[in-house]
Amino acid sequence: MGNSSSKSSKKDSHSNSSSRNPRPQVSRTETSHSVKSAKSNKSSRSRRSLPSSSTTNTNSNVPDPSTPSKPNLEVNHQRHSSHTNRYHFPSSSHSHSNSQNELLTTPSSSSTKRPSTSRRSSYNTKAAADLPPSMIQMEPKSPILKTNNSSTHVSKHKSSYSSTYYENALTDDDNDDKDNDISHTKRFSRSSNSRPSSIRSGSVSRRKSDVTHEEPNNGSYSSNNQENYLVQALTRSNSHASSLHSRKSSFGSDGNTAYSTPLNSPGLSKLTDHSGEYFTSNSTSSLNHHSSRDIYPSKHISNDDDIENSSQLSNIHASMENVNDKNNNITDSKKDPNEEFNDIMQSSGNKNAPKKFKKPIDIDETIQKLLDAGYAAKRTKNVCLKNNEILQICIKAREIFLSQPSLLELSPPVKIVGDVHGQYGDLLRLFTKCGFPPSSNYLFLGDYVDRGKQSLETILLLFCYKIKYPENFFLLRGNHECANVTRVYGFYDECKRRCNIKIWKTFIDTFNTLPLAAIVAGKIFCVHGGLSPVLNSMDEIRHVVRPTDVPDFGLINDLLWSDPTDSPNEWEDNERGVSYCYNKVAINKFLNKFGFDLVCRAHMVVEDGYEFFNDRSLVTVFSAPNYCGEFDNWGAVMSVSEGLLCSFELLDPLDSAALKQVMKKGRQERKLANQQQQMMETSITNDNESQQ
C-alpha cells in the first residue's frame, strides 16, 4: 500500500482485456481532491497488483468496431489523496452488440466540501445552516423501493410462518458460567500462493492475536411432538480432512449439475430428540474448526484464524469436549426462543403490558442519543439506551424487514456500503462524508457486527435509521448476521457484557428477517457474498421464507459466503470451508442470464476500499477503514446516480488517536449547535412572553 504506480498498473490491467461478454458503453469522469489522512508506516508497503497488460492512453480510444469491446478505463489512484472515481452504466437494456466504447475522462478541480444548501434544508429553517450534518432534520426523499402485489403477498405469507419456525438463538442463561470460557491463540497469516494474486489484497501482514471467546452452553428447545420441523443434526468430523470432504448442494433435486459444499459450513444444527440441543459437541467443535477459515479468506487479507499448530488445535478441541460434557448435564427448561420473542411482541401492544413497554420510544431522540455516544469517543460499560428501548428497536425493525421483500428492487440514486464490523466512529465519518439520512439513500450489504468494539451502537443506529426511513434506508444480511458466527467473533460477548443474553437473542431473531439481495435500476445486483450455482431464478430469492437462519448449504448460504476467483473452474469449493468460489465464466453467465451489468458485493477486505474483478463486471466494496486496527486499508462507498453513474467515495484509514480527534471535533460542533438552539428557543420564548 502507498505505491501509486502499482495501483495504476492494477487498474490499467483491465483496459485491454479481451471480452467474452461484451458490455454496454461505459464512460467515466474522475474528480480528485486532497484530503487529510492519517496513515501509518504500513503505507510504505508495496501491494500486489493484477497481471500487467499493455498500458492505455489517457486520451479517448476508439477500438475496432468489428470486435467486441470492453470499457477502457484508466484510474490513476494515488494513495496520499482521497478521490472519487465515476463509472457510467447506461440505463438502456443489456446490449451485447459490437458497439464502440469511448473513454471520457474529465478532470475536475472541485475540492472536498460539505454539501451545503440541499442538505441543509429542514422543517424548521432557523439556524439550519449552522447545524452540523448529524443534527439537520430534512424531509425524507421519495421512496426508492419498488413494490408489487407479488412481493406484498410473499411478505404476508412469510409472517404466517412464525408459528412453525424455530429461531436460531441460544438458550443460555444470562449468568453463564465463566468456567466455560476458553482462551486460545489464533494465528492470522497469509495463505499459500495457490490462490490467484488478482483477488488478493496487497496490504497483507502476518499478525498474531489473542482471541478470547466463550464457548456456548448447550441449551435446549422445548419439544413439540405435533411439529416435525426440526432438522437432524449433521454429524461432522473435527479433523482437517473434513474441510476437504463435500456434499451435494441443491436447491432442488431435479438439477442437472451437482455441486459440493464442505461439511464444516456454518449452518445451525438442530436435533430431533427431546433435548433439542442447539450446539452439540460435534457441531460446536465443528464451529471451532470452521473458524480457522472464517470470514475473510486468506486469498485477500488473511485476518482469519488459521490455527497452524496441530497440537494447539487438538488442545482446543479437547477443551471444547470438556465444556460440552459439562453442558450436557445441564437441564434447560426455557421455552422456544421464537415463543419468547412473540411474547415480547404481544406484550408491546397489550394494554396490560409491563410499564416499560407502554411508552413507545422516540426514534429521533434515540438517534441523537446514539450519535452523542459516538462522538463522545468513549466505550462505556453500558449502552446509552436501556434494554427495553433496545428490545423495542429490534421489534420495530423486525416488523419492517418482514413487510418488505427478501429481494429488494430499488431505484437510484443510492449509496452502497460494504462491511462495517462495529467500527462505529468510522460509520459516523461515513455519514458525515456521504450525508446523514435522509439526505442520501443507503443500501448496506451486511456485516454490521463482530470484530469491531462498538457493534451494539453500530447496529442500533442502523436499525433506527431503518425505522425512521423505511423506504430510503436498506440493510441486507451478511454472513456475520448469524447466531453461530456472532457467538465466536465478538457480538455475543459484547451483548452479554454490556446488556444481557436476551438482548443478543432478540438481535439474532431480527437478523433472521433481513433481506438477502437487492437489484438497483434492474442493472446492478447487490449481495453480501456473491453468486450461487443453484440460483436459477430471481424468484427463488423473492420467495425465501423469513425468518430463517443460515443453512449449512444452498442458496442462502452461497449468497452470504461465496467469493470470486481466477480459477479456471467455473465453480469450486471455497477455501473458507464454506460455499463456493465462482470464476469469470460464472459471472458472465449470470449477467447474461438475468440482464445485469454489474455485481456489487462486499465480504472481503480490499486495500483501496473497492476493487473490480472480471473486467469491471463485479466490484467488491469494503467500508471499514483501518480494519481491526491492524490493516491499512481504505474504506469505500459506491454511489449510484439516477443515470447509473457509479462513483466511489473513500474514507482514509485513521488510527485510534486520529479518529478520536475527528470525533472530538464533531462533538464540539454538536455542543455548539445545541447551545445556539437553546439560546434561540429562549429568545423566542421571551419574545412571546413580552408580546403577551
UniProtKB/Swiss-Prot annotation:
Protein name, entry field: Serine/threonine-protein phosphatase PP-Z1
Main enzyme class: hydrolase
Pfam family, one: STPPase_N
InterPro entries: Calcineurin-like_PHP_ApaH (IPR004843), Metallo-depent_PP-like (IPR029052), PP1_catalytic_subunit (IPR050341), PPPtase_PPZ/Ppq1 (IPR011159), Ser/Thr-sp_prot-phosphatase (IPR006186), STPPase_N (IPR031675)
GO molecular function, one term: metal ion binding
Active-site feature positions: H480 (proton donor)
Residues annotated for Mn(2+) 1 binding in this entry: D419, H421, D447
Catalytic activity, reaction form: O-phospho-L-seryl-[protein] + H2O = L-seryl-[protein] + phosphate; O-phospho-L-threonyl-[protein] + H2O = L-threonyl-[protein] + phosphate
Role description: Essential for the maintenance of cell size and integrity in response to osmotic stress.
Cellular component aspect of the GO annotation: cytoplasm; nucleus
Regulation: Inhibited by the regulatory subunits VHS3 and SIS2.
Note describing how the cofactor binds: Binds 2 manganese ions per subunit.
Record-stated family: Belongs to the PPP phosphatase family. PP-Z subfamily.
Binding site for Mn(2+) 2: D447, N479, H528, H603
Compositional bias annotation for Low complexity: 32-41, 49-69, 91-122, 190-204, 280-289
Oligomeric form and interacting partners: Interacts with SIS2 and VHS3, which regulate its activity.
PANTHER family noted in UniProt: SERINE/THREONINE PROTEIN PHOSPHATASE, SERINE_THREONINE-PROTEIN PHOSPHATASE PP-Z1-RELATED
Phosphoserine: residues bearing it: S49, S209, S222, S265, S690
SMART domains tied to this protein: PP2Ac
Biased composition, class Acidic residues, residue ranges: 170-179
Organism: Saccharomyces cerevisiae (strain ATCC 204508 / S288c)
Compositional bias per record (Basic and acidic residues), positions renumbered to this chain: 207-216, 291-303
